[in-house]
Amino acid sequence: VGYMPNYESLWAVATAINKGYFEEQGLDIKLTSFQVDEAGIGLMASGSVDVAYIGADVHNRCIEGAAQIFCSSLKVSGETADCQSWGCLPGYVEANKDILVRFTKALYKAMDYGSQEANYDEVAGYVADICGADKATELEQAKEGNWIDSKTLLQYLGDGTLKKYNESQQKNFIDAGDVDKKVPIED
């Protein structure tokens, strides 16, 4: 599992590891850190990791087909949402659907736990331990956003909110010249 050493990338994975949610799903997780958003896709392409965190800045590569999103996550702040995801190479989904379903179940259970403000301190400690960072700094990052749970994410998927966020993100990439043309969000 490729991740960036920050709260946004790690909060759900760190929680799933420390609470035993991956283990419940029969998954043995090995973490690989990367420093630049684009590097996660490179790690997958090289075979170093099967899945990687894909931050909002690199979703343009998913639009271009370099990676496929299998699990979404949002950080909501006021009127905006950062669309973050867990992705894999396009062919990995078909060959490893069972693994991805179990990974997603563990992440969603971790999101349900870690999105509760009462648990921010604990989750910040998990992230700090993995990153070798200061817990207080990670806790500040936790307080910067509204981390959603799986129920809210599924509601956003069902009512079209997630699609609207992704369409807005795609439009921003097109307007900035980072993506040439619009593609169906469902892809």
How would you name each of these model-derived features?
Residues 34-35, 93, 117:
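Conserved aromatic
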Residues 1-81:
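Short, glycine-/small- and polar/acidic-enriched structural segments
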Residues 180-187:
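Intrinsically disordered, low-complexity polar segments
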Residues 15-16, 82-97:
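A bilobed periplasmic-binding-protein/Venus flytrap-type ligand-binding module shared by bacterial periplasmic
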Residues 96-180:
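Secondary-structure end/capping motifs
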Residues 18, 91, 108-112:
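Short glycine/serine- and small hydrophobic-enriched flexible loop segments
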Residues 78-83, 141-143:
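A glycine-rich, aromatic-flanked flexible loop/lid motif
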Residues 23, 77, 93-98, 102:
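Hinge/capping helix and adjacent helix->loop/strand transition within the periplasmic-binding protein
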